[in-house]
Each structure stands twice: as structure tokens, then as C-alpha cells.
Amino acid sequence: MKPQELAKEVAKRRTFAIISHPDAGKTTITEQLLLFGGVIREAGTVKGRKSGHFAKSDWMEIEKKRGISVTSSVMQFNYQGKRINILDTPGHEDFSEDTYRTLMAVDAAVMVIDSAKGIEAQTKKLFKVVKQRGIPIFTFMNKLDRDGREPLDLIAELEDLLGIEGYAMNWPIGMGKGLKGLYDRVNQRIELYRREGDDRFLPLNDQGQLDPSQPLTQDSIYTQTLDDIELLNDAGNQFNLKKIMAGEQTPVFFGSALTNFGVETFLNSFVQYAPEPGPKKTEQGGEVNPTNPELSAFVFKIQANMNPAHRDRIAFVRIVSGEFERGMDVILHRTGKTMRLNNSTEFMADTRETVSTAVAGDIVGLYDTGNFQIGDTIYQGKEPIQFEKLPQFTPELFVRVTPKNVMKQKSFHKGMQQLVQEGAVQLYKTYNTNDYILGAVGQLQFEVFQFRMLHEYHSEVIMTPIGSRTARWINPDQLDEKMSSSRNLLVQDIHGDPLFLFENQYAERWFADKYPDVKLTAKM
């Protein structure tokens, strides 16, 4: 591809993640975006475990049974001349590490907030990561079809709790059963609730008001809306695209994903204002420009058994620069070895299509036989490239894990190996007995692991809790196996590095007093 063509294609890309607290409506709005992208004909909401109607973005069996997202899905479609890459992230807090890594692979984020509840705990955590990245954040205040909090309070909360300016792109005219429509400040029109086609839009005059002949003008809710708009214009934040690009101001859209109200207006604005792919920093201290003709990319996720019939493994790769072509040779930085990328795919949750070409900003799936690890960099060219490391959480909960049927050791070990490589749980082995110990941030990760071992590898496992522990790594040169006890269990991680799992802070303090010269670290 010629440089001009590459630059033109890269400029079409819009790659973003959707973040929210569980049950704020993240999966539902994802469905509606896919509907506008022409990918699906009917949007279905994730319902209870007894329901047979599941979301397109929730593909794993346990997600369908429990109505929660525990993996990051990737969905791609074309819209208004742009190539949209959506990464739908886990809403459950136990899977926040997967979400954090996903946020390293996007150029913008969409924050979905339940307008009845406002900003919740998980939203705060995820916002902090997005803020650190300095990427634009677009906010969708959801569930306007239900009674919720005052819109002015929701806007103020963005600044008070998250420290980011909010600019209301539209404004609700009523809510819940009294919802009449949205006052569109950008397009100077009113979008009526539950109307189809062009009939749902009413133009505003130069004073920002409806023609007096419109029935809505006689409603007190409309009058209240005009008062709110006047207050926003006089005392609210001014729209500032520069601040938005720096992650200092967030455009706020009100709507209802469930009733598909306000979603199209949001999508149109997002496509207009969201950034195209930008440069990415390297461990070497430089940065790689997306229009650099030589391919560079990094692995931000590994997923086993997206197609259980084939027991496959997919490495999710974000292209940072250049053009990807199926069959090309690249260098894997971690090993220094050249590898050929023969098998590649693009996604719609669990469905895939073979992809022959892709450019910077795109997400590509590479069939993996065990070559890749999360955080790996692949590149072309003579100069080695290693992108900045992805975040890794230190586990806090631990269990011993054994197969219930010792005759099924082969499937047990294969399942352990493949699921651990996805990064949701960490694997350790005890020093003397080689017992398997799993570490996780939350209990749900263990439940998902156990479920997948049984249903994907036909290996029933027994998990014996050893409780909440603090992991501390030790320099191998200072290690003496006699230091180990039940209170500070000596294990090794998948890289063979030794660490202690301390029962509590008293055990850690006792160890420090007994071995004052031994240096322990939170991460290796």
C-alpha cells in the first residue's frame, strides 16, 4: 500500500472501548451500535440465566448463563465511511485486569452511566486508567426511559468525583414515563421520543426554541428544559475539542440504549469527534507513528476456545503502525525469532472471518499454537521495537487446584496451560510438591475457571481455598527453602521465579524481622 493510501485508511479507523459499572447498560448500547453498523438485524438484551436470548457481544457459555460479561469481545463494522472497532470490556470487577489491558489497545473510551445511579465504584476505577492514558472519553447517560437523577446533578458529579469537565451535547426533556425527547444542542433540533424516521426531529429557531405551534411548547417540561439550556449556556462549560482530545473534557449524551433513543445521535457525534489512531510509546524511549509503513503491533489479550469444536487459541493484536498482510514475516521481540502470520481473523464476538489485510488501528486475531504471550510485540524492520508493558495485577485470593479424576491428567494439564495463558488467573507451583495453586483478584475468576475446565476440557477440578494472601517475590540468590512455612508458603510462578504467599501482614512482618537482609518485592 502506498504511503498516501495507508494514511487515508488509518484516518478512517475509530477504535474504542466501552466501560461501565455492571448493569449500567454497556452490552445493550453495544448491541444498538452494531444495529446501526448493519451487523445485526435485531438487538437483544442480556437477560437472566433462564432466558434464551443473549447478546451478540457475550459469546462464552458462562456469560450466556449468568448474564454477565467476563471477557473482552471485539466487534468490527463500517459506518459513514469509517471503520469502527469496538472492544466490549468485562463489567465485573473481578475481571478488571482484562479490562485494563484492553484499554491499552484503544484510542478512545465510551463511559456508560446509569442515570438513576450516577457514577459507581467500578466506573471510577476504570475512568482512572483511561485518564492516565490521556485518551478522549465520551459519556452516555443511559436509562433515560426510567426515572433518574437530575441531569444537572449528573453533570456536576463528573467534575466532583472524576475531576473531568462535562459538556452536555444534548439534554433530556423529561424522563421515565414523562420522557418527551432530547434537546440537541449541537444540531439545534429536538429529537422526539418514540417517533420513527425524520418525523422524530423538530428544528429549533435562532433563539434555540421550537415554533410556538408545536404542541410540545405547551408542556411545562419543555419550559423547564429551556431554563436548563439557558443555565448551561450561561454558566456551563464551553465545548472545547482540544480539551476533549486530551481527556480533560467529556462530551455527555443522554439517551436510552434499551429503547434505542439518542444512540444514533451519539454514534454520529462520536464518529465525527473521536480521534484516529495516534503514535505509541516504546520501551526504548521513542514512539511509533501509525503511518510508518513497517508493521508493528502488540498482543493485549489471548483467548482459548472461542471455537470449542477446534480447541483453538486466538491472540488479539492491536496494529500500531503499517499494514498487516496475511502470510507476512515478522519478528517476535521477546524471542528475537522470525515468524510467519499465516492464519488471521477479524471478529464479531464468536463469529469470525478470515482477514487478508488490516492497517494501524485495527484489531486482528492470530491463531496461536503457544508462541504468543500477553504484552508481546511483533514488528518488521531492522530496529527492534518493544511497546510499553501492559498492567498486571498481583492476585489476592489463592486456591489449590487438583483434578477430581486422576485418570484425566492430560485434559487437566492442557486446560490449566491454556486458560492460565489468558491472564485472568495466575498459576503457581509449590516448591517441594509441585502442587498447583491459582491466584486471582476476585472469586468469580475461580468460578469461571472451574466452569470452563469442566465444559471446555471435560476436566472436573477440586479447588481448596488457602485464603487471602500477599504475594512477595524474592531474589533467587537470597532464597533458602527453609524460609518456607504454612504462614509464608514458598512457590514459583510460571517463569520459575520464587515468591512467598504470606498469610497476613503479621506473617510478612515476622519474616522481615527474622531475615532483615532479604529483599522482597510486590512484582518481579
Curated annotation (Swiss-Prot):
It comes from Lacticaseibacillus paracasei (strain ATCC 334 / BCRC 17002 / CCUG 31169 / CIP 107868 / KCTC 3260 / NRRL B-441) (Lactobacillus paracasei). Its main location: cytoplasm. GO terms for biological process: regulation of translational termination. Disulfide bonds: none annotated. Increases the formation of ribosomal termination complexes and stimulates activities of RF-1 and RF-2. It binds guanine nucleotides and has strong preference for UGA stop codons. It may interact directly with the ribosome. The stimulation of RF-1 and RF-2 is significantly reduced by GTP and GDP, but not by GMP. Keywords: Cytoplasm, GTP-binding, Nucleotide-binding, Protein biosynthesis. PROSITE patterns: G_TR_1 (PS00301), G_TR_2 (PS51722). One of its GO terms (cellular component) is cytosol. Belongs to the TRAFAC class translation factor GTPase superfamily. Classic translation factor GTPase family. PrfC subfamily. GTP binds at residues 20-27, 88-92, 142-145. Residues 11-278 form the tr-type G domain. This is Peptide chain release factor 3. GO terms for molecular function: GTP binding; GTPase activity; translation release factor activity, codon nonspecific; translation release factor activity, codon specific.
